[in-house]
Amino acid sequence: MIMKKLLLLFPLLLSCLWGIAADEFRVAELRCEYRDNPLAINTLTPQFSWQTLSVGRGFLQAGYQIQVASDPADLARGRKLLWDEQRKSDVSLHVRYAGRTLKPGQRYYWRVRVSDAAGNYSPWSEIRSFAVGLLDGSDWDGARWIAFEELPDSLRVVPGQEFNKIKIGDRKTALNRLPQFRREVKVTKPVERATVYVSGLGQFELFLNGAKVGDNFLDPAWSDYDRQVCYQTFDISEELQPGGNVFGVMLRSEEHTSELQ
């Protein structure tokens, strides 16, 4: 009986060992500028990072190969690469891009594989993406600020100046509703990718065809508006529909301030 158990156990162990040898290590947790598939990075030379998963103990990365392309199909075939670096190194953090010049507002795709000390390579990682943001004022050419109608002085409520005695039934008329903007856009051709960049002096919410875009709150981040204005990026490729589309923006009711306390 003991011999039969040993004979049954041996093929089981052998099959487990054979499975380990077939797929020993792979790459996971790919990040570009510390983010997964970022929509807008603020540099033309991004940094890449990844982790290596191994079924065996003590695995050490001895080298890597990283590739970047502007089209995922070209990247999968290893064609029209913007960057293809193969190096003997155990570094897997902050690998700086050193390929052809990237362009603001464009999306790119990348993948990586690693090797062990014997020169054996892992399978290629999943293809990930990143997009370069709008880095300077010239990238905003064609965009313009939009604003609510000018508020007449007779309807302006000035803090500290409105302490008049008010009795029940008296009213004060003012334009205190939330400023809202609406714009219709017609899509007449197939759209592969659509990105919206929105900036505002204060907070805003963006709507497309009646639905709020994204799950963010209090966009954009606060800053000193005399020096810098932040913006938010949204991928609306799936929300944009053929034919007519309606964009809406609702701003916060309070006036923006250039000094943050």
Describe these PLM feature segments.
Residues 1-6:
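Positively charged n-region of N-terminal signal peptides that target proteins for export
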Residues 8-16:
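Bacterial N-terminal signal peptides
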Residues 17-21:
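Sec/Tat signal peptide C-region and signal peptidase I cleavage site
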Residues 22-57, 126-140:
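Pro/Thr/Ser/Gly-rich low-complexity, intrinsically disordered linker/stalk tracts
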Residues 29, 47, 61-65, 193, ...:
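Exposed beta-strand and adjacent loop surfaces of beta-rich binding modules
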Residues 133-171, 249-258:
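An acidic-aromatic loop/edge-strand motif
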